[in-house]
């Protein structure tokens, strides 16, 4: 880290400590929209970022209507991204549970987003082509625990009657899941765009609470720093692009 960047970061942390005007910051963009990069930006800005695996573990209970673990988790840090914040309409609950918070909707070109989803998942299973991904790959994934990824994936994209509410697809039965839609581009992009639009509608009239940003094209953290009320000196800090797929 060069001396100038170190000074900018120190100024940001000092500003947050002395005059922070918000409660929490939630990255609510879907997976593969720059959420890892956003976590790095939060750290650069002097925010304590919630542990991602701990956050993912709260998804399981929150989908079933139990928010106690999610609340306890959020109380112990400043900024969050990925699951469960990238899922469905959890942003509505967060807005009610943590007043005066800020929300960042990370977006990217829908076609690029879908290709990134396929590449990431194929790589996870050692496949050369995303078209080789099967229901069995998803169901047998051991990440967190067996069944975690299958539930999350089905919940996000494969519901027979998708309403994108924060409930568990598995609670309404396996027959509610349309596995034949697995990585169907049109279905996935529709779900992606539908959720983004629901976020925009919910925060309409509250521009101070929602920032929408394409992390793949942003060259600096200027927009995020301005949104959080950080010093102008951070406007030239480069965007720390991470985990590209």
Per-range role (PLM):
Residues 54-62, 104-115, 133, 177, ...:
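The conserved 3'-phosphoadenosine-5'-phosphosulfate
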């Amino acid at each position: 880290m060069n001396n100038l960047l170190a000074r900018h970061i120190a100024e940001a942390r000092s500003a947050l400590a002395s005059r922070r005007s918000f409660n929490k910051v939630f990255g609510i963009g879907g997976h593969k929209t720059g959420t890892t990069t956003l976590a790095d930006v939060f750290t650069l800005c002097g925010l304590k970022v919630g542990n991602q695996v701990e956050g993912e573990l709260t998804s399981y209970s929150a989908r079933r209507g139990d928010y106690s673990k999610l609340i306890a988790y959020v109380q112990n840090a400043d900024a969050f991204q990925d699951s469960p914040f990238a899922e469905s309409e959890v942003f509505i609950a967060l807005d009610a549970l943590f007043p005066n918070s800020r929300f960042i909707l990370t977006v990217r070109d829908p076609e690029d987003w879908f290709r990134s989803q396929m590449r990431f998942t194929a790589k996870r299973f050692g496949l050369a082509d995303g078209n080789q991904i099967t229901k069995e790959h998803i169901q047998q994934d051991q990440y967190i625990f067996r069944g975690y990824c299958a539930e999350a994936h089905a919940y996000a994209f494969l519901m027979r009657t998708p309403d994108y509410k924060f409930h568990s697809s598995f609670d309404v039965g396996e027959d509610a899941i349309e596995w034949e839609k697995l990585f169907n581009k049109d279905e996935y992009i529709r779900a992606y765009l539908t959720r983004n639009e629901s976020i925009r509608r919910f925060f309409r009239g509250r521009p101070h609470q929602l920032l929408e940003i394409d992390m793949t094209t942003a060259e600096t953290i200027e927009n995020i720093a301005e949104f959080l009320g950080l010093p102008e000196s951070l406007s030239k800090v480069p965007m720390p692009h991470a985990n590209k797929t």
